[in-house]
C-alpha cells in the first residue's frame, strides 16, 4: 500500500463541499474535504468547516490535528472541549455530540473504521 501525502494542508484546495448533515440552527455550516479511503478501513484527509452548529454522527475512531480556526465540541456524555489551531484530538468510536464552529476550522484527520 502506498504512502499517502497531503502537501501544504493549510492552503490545499479541497475537492468536495456540502452542507453538514444535521445542522442545528439557521446558519448551516458547509464542510469541505479532500480524502483518501483505503481498503483496510482507514480514511485520511483534510477537512474544513464554516461557522455553525451541528450534530456529529461519525461512529469511527478519529485522530485529528487542527490547522486553523476555533470551535467547541460537546460529547453526549462529557464536558465541552474548547479547540483552536494547534490542538489535536483522539476520539474513540461512537463519540457523538455537538460541534459549534465559531471561526472556520481546518484539520487533518484519520478515521479508523
Each PLM stretch: what is its role?
Residues 49, 58-73:
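Short, conserved beta-strand element in jelly-roll/cupin
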Residues 1-41:
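A short, N-terminal "cap"/entry segment at the start of jelly-roll beta-barrel domains
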Residues 3, 44-46, 63, 88-90:
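Conserved hydrophobic/aromatic beta-strand scaffold that supports enzyme active sites
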Residues 90, 97, 103-113:
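A short hydrophobic beta-strand segment most commonly corresponding to one strand
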Residues 50, 79, 95, 104-105:
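A generic "binding-loop/recognition-motif" signal
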Residues 38-58, 92-93:
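Conserved short histidine dyad/triad with adjacent acidic residue
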Residues 45-46, 54-59, 75, 81-82, ...:
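Short histidine-centered beta-strand/loop micro-motifs
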Residues 78-94:
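Short acidic-glycine-tyrosine-enriched beta hairpin
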Amino acid at each position: 500500500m502506498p504512502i499517502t501525502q497531503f502537501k501544504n494542508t493549510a492552503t490545499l484546495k479541497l475537492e468536495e463541499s456540502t452542507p453538514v448533515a444535521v445542522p442545528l440552527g439557521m446558519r448551516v455550516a458547509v464542510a469541505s474535504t479532500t480524502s483518501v479511503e483505503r481498503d483496510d478501513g482507514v480514511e485520511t484527509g483534510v477537512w474544513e468547516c464554516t461557522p455553525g452548529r451541528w450534530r456529529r454522527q461519525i461512529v469511527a475512531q478519529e485522530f485529528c490535528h487542527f490547522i486553523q480556526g476555533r470551535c467547541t465540541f460537546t460529547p453526549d456524555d462529557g464536558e465541552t472541549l474548547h479547540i483552536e489551531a494547534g490542538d489535536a484530538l483522539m476520539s474513540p468510536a461512537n463519540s457523538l455530540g455537538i460541534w459549534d464552529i465559531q471561526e472556520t476550522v481546518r484539520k487533518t484527520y484519520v478515521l479508523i473504521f
